[in-house]
Amino acid sequence: MTKEQILVDVQEAIAEKLGKEQSEITLDKSFKDDLGADSLEVMELVMDLEDKFEITIEDDQAENLKTVGDVVSYIETQV
């Protein structure tokens, strides 16, 4: 799976969870500051991504995933 495909899949999940347009979900966007996600939404998104990519994201690792780019890079190392 390419980084670009991971990004598209992550964008789709974020758009669905947060009600955002995929075009505004870029690698540099912060979940909380730019996309307006609260802590619960971020944790729900992590669970959705775990299911989508069939991976496990440990809680301590999830806390370090602040931007869309962080998530894409992490998933890239896991698939």
Curated annotation (Swiss-Prot):
Residue intervals of the Carrier domain: 1-79
InterPro entries recorded: ACP, ACP-like_sf, PP-bd_ACP, Ppantetheine_attach_site
GO cellular component: cytosol; membrane
Protein modification: 4'-phosphopantetheine is transferred from CoA to a specific serine of apo-ACP by AcpS. This modification is essential for activity because fatty acids are bound in thioester linkage to the sulfhydryl of the prosthetic group.
NCBIfam families the UniProt entry points to: acyl_carrier, PRK00982.1-2, PRK00982.1-4
Modification type O-(pantetheine 4'-phosphoryl)serine: residues: S39
Primary localisation category: cytoplasm
The protein, known as: Acyl carrier protein
Superkingdom of source: Bacteria
GO biological process, one term: lipid A biosynthetic process
KW Cell cycle (keyword) present: no
MF GO annotations: acyl binding; acyl carrier activity
Species: Exiguobacterium sibiricum (strain DSM 17290 / CCUG 55495 / CIP 109462 / JCM 13490 / 255-15)
PANTHER family the UniProt entry points to: ACYL CARRIER PROTEIN (PTHR20863), CARRIER DOMAIN-CONTAINING PROTEIN (PTHR20863:SF76)
Pathway assignment: Lipid metabolism; fatty acid biosynthesis
A Pfam match: PP-binding
HAMAP family: Acyl_carrier
Claim: Lipid biosynthesis is one of the keywords in the record: yes
Record's keyword terms, sorted: Cytoplasm, Fatty acid biosynthesis, Fatty acid metabolism, Lipid biosynthesis, Lipid metabolism, Phosphopantetheine, Phosphoprotein
